[in-house]
Amino acid sequence: MVNQKIQDRLAALRAVMKENGVDWYMVPTADFHNSEYVDAYFKVREYLCNFSGSNGTLIVGMDEAGLWTDGRYFIQAERELTGTGVTLYRMLEDNVPTKEEFLQQKMENGQTLGFDGRVVDTRFGLKLEKDLADKQIKIVYGKDLADEVWTDRPALPCHPVLVPDEALFGQNVSEKLAAVRKDMAAHGASGLFLSKLDDLMWLLNIRGADVECNPVALSYAYLTQDECHFFLQDGEVTDVLKAHAAKYHITLHPYEEAAEWMESCTITGSVMCDEGNVSYAFYKILENRAEVIDAANPTELLKAVKNETELANMQEVYLKDSVAVCKFIYWVKKNVGKIPMTEYSAAMYLDHLRSEIDGYLDLSFPTISAYGTNAAMMHYEATEDNCAALAPEGMLLVDSGGQYLGGTTDVTRTIVLGPVSQTIKEHYTAVAKGMLQLTDAKFLYGCTGRNLDILARQPMWDQNIDYKCGTGHGVGYILNVHEGPQGIRWRFTGNQKEVPIEAGMDVTNEPGIYIEGSHGIRTVSYTHLRAHETA
């Protein structure tokens, strides 16, 4: 079946490309801050190709288009791309070209590649420059062509910033700024440009509401050893925030003036930024002003190692959150087959239970409630109009979490609702074994998540089965549910950072088995890493 709506949108984009002399146009999944989850304003890729997953890049030429996404979304992408004319490219699969390889193969000498430089990270942009240089490809990044096609595009999000009691964080802003400036000095940098939203929220002990399920505010910051300049939208600024900023000698600026300010401000010495997070467009500004030092944001590792206050609050929050999940499991098992129940209505009930918890702010991601064959799609999302009815047979996979004043949660349970096959029992057991093996791990300091991944994955590998995603990720503190730099995965792609596991870090532990057309099983538990006391 032809998806005429999407084909018409692609045709409109191609017309705009032609008017602007662009032969190929690239649309990643990102906002101006390289965020994993983005507001509706930034969902350009979904608008143009119908794929709704959280990770994917669309590349459009005059005669063809392709979407690149990872193993979490292969099944979902196949369904959503049907009839669009967009080809699915399964990332990291054999004989599948990367985005760069595809462009090298398809683009002719002297052609033009376009993208919005505000939503492409510097590292990838510089790699494209290098990989396409032999063909003398021109890169244009100063215009959002899709904006001319998406005529009813939502407005840029803008919500007042929350300034919680600083006792909640275990450190005040002065202490955090001092730690960051110490790292800047160690790198020989006189300035630091920050654009990663959760890092900014952590550093200034504030929270926002500009991205669904992620308590962050669209913002930038520029630090020197003596100054801190913070850029955010007028509608995000409150009197409480003004007082908070004044207390810590933070200068507030309009968000939309960040680029212009960086082009004209006084810069002495070098500027530090993380090329994996700063946009290509902003990097070009910095590159023209000063020597740029590519280094990880100091905030990233500092944020990843939770202090005692954060850990204590997280433990309390997880206890309350777990009670809600237990109530939900009891409710589902007691009522399935007795009252009308769907994937969607079950998810709504769990969301309601969480909303009653003291300190509740929001979900930490949209609840995944997947029954039967739908659970084989790792990030399936049921809607009121498109969901399966539950019956007292098979399994319901529920992956969910909450944001609270005190922590962020992420938990998955696969609930057996009735009779299942022997194969499913064996798969369920393998997943449980993997989760328990990783939970009980003791390891030498210096290990990274790549050293530990096999503990969770081995029971699946013993059955010649694998899951096409990582095993675990860090969890933010009243921040993004996916946090780095730590993670547990066996495959190293070169784009991901590897750091030793430190005491105070946290990771999820989430092995799984996904059999297309049959079932999906995942168990996710939150794990706190601590130093092991030896005799």
Roles of regions detected by a PLM:
Residues 2-108, 120, 124-263, 367-368, ...:
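N-terminal accessory/capping or targeting/presequence segment of soluble
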Residues 3-43, 63, 178-202, 322-384, ...:
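Active-site cores enriched in adjacent His and Asp/Glu residues with nearby glycine-rich loops
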Residues 26, 47, 59, 66-68, ...:
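Structured core elements
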Residues 111-131, 141, 145-149, 155-183, ...:
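Extended, domain-scale alpha-helical bundle/helix-rich regions
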Residues 119-120, 401-406, 512-516:
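Short, charged beta-turn/beta-strand-edge "cap" motif at the junction between a beta-strand
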Residues 244-285, 295, 420-445, 449-454, ...:
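Conserved catalytic alpha/beta cores of large enzymes that bind or transform nucleotide phosphates
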Residues 381-413, 418-421, 426-427:
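Non-catalytic terminal/interface segments that mediate subunit docking, oligomerization
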Residues 527-535:
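Conserved small/polar residues in nucleotide/adenosyl-binding loops
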